[in-house]
Amino acid sequence: MKKITIALLIGLFATVSVNAQMKEGKIVYERKINMWKMITDPEMRTRIPEFRTSEFELLFNEQASLFRSVPEDEAPDPFANSGGGGGPRFMFRMPETTTFTDLATQMQYESRPMFEKTFLIVDSLKPLKWKISEETKTIAKHVCKKATTTVTAQNVRIGGTGGFRLGRNNNDTAKGSTVITPKETEVIVWYTQDIVASVGPDNYTGLPGAILEVDLDNGANIITATEVSSKYAKKDLVQPTKGERMNKAQFQDTMKKLMEDMQKGGGMGGMRIRMGNN
């Protein structure tokens, strides 16, 4: 009789544990970009904060997810406590993007405002080859496992003038321009099985749970969950439809042409720059 009672209790606790797994909700992330890893000019570094932080949120259920940036109108001045020298200072504001992922069809719809227009980038998700580790750590009160993969990312190097060039090697930055080249990059993520949905920030999915942290290129770009909640605005979890529709390859070709035009005429497109003085 005791054995039966113990077995029933174990079964009950197992059921409770499974039911406790989140199937829908919201994850708030902080993205921290190391700007100095892109900037080679020492003088320009004194005018730009080492780290650029921004906030994002991921709305999700078992069918879809929506990753979007949080408005930065009230963002604090990163130079407020830096103690930097005088002269003009640069603050970079990235365009506010929205990425919707249909988990059933593995299709992604990204609305991206750039160059005074909106692009709707529609394409299938590229499966990532994850290597899962048993190493764990806690993020936002959730135990996470480690996984790694490699991706081809855009390697950006900014020289002294800030002009744009599509170069082939980092030596081009000595000419005082910005060089964008493809680069094989390691990605380390931490995911939790406390959340059933296979979701994550940006294009990072495909693990048995939700990704709560992404480390791209050894700290160059880190996205970390700061809050996880079962409550979210369900009405906002919808596929974007507005914008000039194209796939990722077409978008990359369009960006290449626009960057070349920027090199000739100047401008930063959808990226905003604020300048000020100490």
Question: Model regions: which residues?
Answer:
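Extended soluble regions of mature proteins
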Residues: M22-N278
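Bacterial Sec-dependent N-terminal signal peptides
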Residues: M1-I27, N278
